[in-house]
Every structure is written in structure tokens, then in C-alpha cells.
Design a protein with these regions (language model features):
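RNA pseudouridine synthases
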Residues: 2-293
């Protein structure tokens, strides 16, 4: 019996028709999953050949053998409430982080997205480390990229605009917008207290451009889609404050009103050209339920 669908809640059973090694057999039978994913399944102890648990990648299969992959085999799962792996291959991760955790820290004792991924890599016997490619603020949720080695991270950094061609956010803001769409541009610069200030004129800071499009208006709030030409620190929060529609739950650049119990900002879309395989990869997550208005 061959399973046509990769479903981690079902037991998968396959009959061996021709000689093969166990690792490539799993990759073929499970809808062409990556080598890394197949290794993770084997390492987890979920694979049985003729009733015997097998973790050996090159275990030799012969015709008429039965390969069984147990229920709840864990594919790309980390043991953390903060992070979910959306995509993984031998070069990089795409992850979705919750609001409330930082991406990385110089203090190794801090729990960060990076430290959680490094624990996952170690547990799954992958000899590499997670390298930060870009960041989201602690209180912003959404999609993030991490590389598995410095060379891949450097390829993103050297060709960021050409490689990562579409990043979009959704924001819940105070006020009912009337304008359907627009562009905000200014120079952004931090003061000594690390508060970012915006200026229409060059203030020695960095030029930033944010495009916005209204999604919905309801009862004193607006839901807005945002696309960035630049990725400056606090760019979206400062720019939305500039036009009089501060992000909900923002104590720094808004009034701090906590209607939804968090900052109303989520990175929902990420599209890029894989720097190694040249695949065009597109990822999108649902808007947080708390953003419903």
C-alpha cells in the first residue's frame, strides 16, 4: 500500500518492489521530501523494516520487504512554543516566529529563535549552525530566514534586493484610513535613547520607503498591508506613526493601547530566489486571529 499524501498523523506502509537503500526509498515514497527531512524521520526511530526499528541510512532493502513509518513521525518540528519550521533544506530554514521572542542575542543563555534552531540541528545530528539573515522585532510575529552556514548567509547579504524580492507585513492600526493606498518615505535616525526619528529631509539617517494598501476598516481600526523597499529598524512602526495611524499595542511609537494583547504587526509573506538551487520559493502565513476586526 502506497500513501499518496504526507500525513504525520497516519501510519505509512510501503512494499519494496526493487532493491534500494532505505534513505532514498523514503525520499521517493514520501512525495520527494528532502534528504534532510528523510534523515530526520530515520533518526527519530519512526521507521520499521519488517517490524524492526531501523535508523541506518544505507540499510539495504530487497523486494517483498515491508517499510512502515509510524504514526506522528515528526517532520521539521522543533520542541518550542515560539518557533515553527515552515521550510527546510540542506542550506536554509524558513521559520515562523511568534510575538515575544528575539531572533538572536550575544548572550548564549538567552532563548532566541537562533538558539532554538541550533538545539533542533544538534538533536537531529546536523553538523551546522543557524545563521541570522534578517530579523524581526521581539514583538513582531511572522516569517524569517536562517542559513545553515555562513556562505549561504553571505549570498543573501550580497544580493539582498535581487534575492529576496517580496516581503509583506500586515498591521492593525488605530484610526480609520480613508486613503486606499500610498507610499511613505523619509530618513530614519536613532537618538541617544535608541528612539527612531523620522524626517522628510536628510538628517544623516537612512532613507526608508514603505508602501501601504488598506485591507479593511472597522470601528476605529484599520487593517493594512505593507511592502518595504528598504528594511530599516522600526521602519513600519515609525512610518505608520508619521501618517497618523500608529500600530496597535505599540508603547514606543503609539499610545500603547493593548486591544489585542500584543503588537499588531505580522510578517505574512516572504518570496525569494534560492541562492544555491535558484528555485523561486514563496511562503505565506495566515493573519493572526487577533487581527480580525
Amino acid at each position: 500500500m502506497q500513501n499518496k499524501k504526507d500525513n504525520s498523523n497516519k501510519e505509512l506502509v510501503f512494499k519494496v518492489l526493487e532493491a534500494d537503500e532505505l534513505l532514498p526509498f523514503i525520499m521517493k515514497k514520501m512525495n520527494g521530501i528532502s534528504r534532510t527531512k528523510a534523515k530526520n524521520i530515520l533518526t527519530s526511530g519512526s521507521v520499521y523494516v519488517n517490524g524492526k526499528s531501523v535508523t541506518q541510512h544505507n540499510y539495504q532493502l530487497t523486494p517483498e520487504m515491508e517499510v512502515r513509518i509510524g504514526k506522528n513521525h515528526k517532520l521539521n518540528q522543533v520542541e518550542s512554543q515560539w518557533v515553527k519550521i515552515v521550510y527546510e533544506d540542506q542550506y536554509l530554514f524558513v521559520v515562523e516566529k511568534k510575538a515575544g521572542i528575539i531572533c538572536h542575542s550575544p548572550n548564549p543563555a538567552d532563548e532566541t529563535v537562533q538558539s532554538i534552531l541550533n538545539q533542533y540541528l544538534e538533536k537531529n545530528h546536523q553538523r551546522c549552525h543557524a545563521h541570522t539573515i534578517h530579523r524581526l522585532d521581539r514583538d513582531t510575529s511572522g516569517l524569517l530566514l536562517f542559513a545553515k552556514d555562513k556562505k549561504v548567509a553571505l549570498k543573501f547579504e550580497e544580493n539582498w534586493k535581487e534575492t529576496v524580492y517580496d516581503r509583506r507585513y500586515v498591521a492593525l492600526v488605530h484610526g480609520e484610513m480613508r486613503k486606499q493606498e500610498g507610499t511613505i518615505s523619509s530618513w530614519l535616525k536613532d537618538n541617544a535613547q535608541f528612539v527612531t526619528y523620522s524626517s522628510k529631509y536628510d538628517n544623516g539617517g537612512k532613507f526608508a520607503v514603505t508602501h501601504y494598501k488598506l485591507i479593511k476598516v472597522s470601528d476605529g481600526y484599520s487593517l493594512v498591508e505593507l511592502k518595504l523597499d528598504t528594511g530599516r529598524k522600526n521602519q513600519i512602526r515609525v512610518h505608520l506613526q508619521d501618517i497618523g495611524f500608529p500600530v496597535v499595542g505599540d508603547p514606543k511609537y503609539g499610545d500603547g493601547d493593548d486591544k489585542i494583547g500584543r503588537l499588531g504587526l505580522h510578517a505574512f509573506k516572504l518570496c525569494f530566489i534560492h541562492p544555491i538551487t535558484r528555485q523561486d520559493l514563496k511562503f505565506e502565513t495566515p493573519f493572526p486571529k487577533s487581527f480580525d476586526i
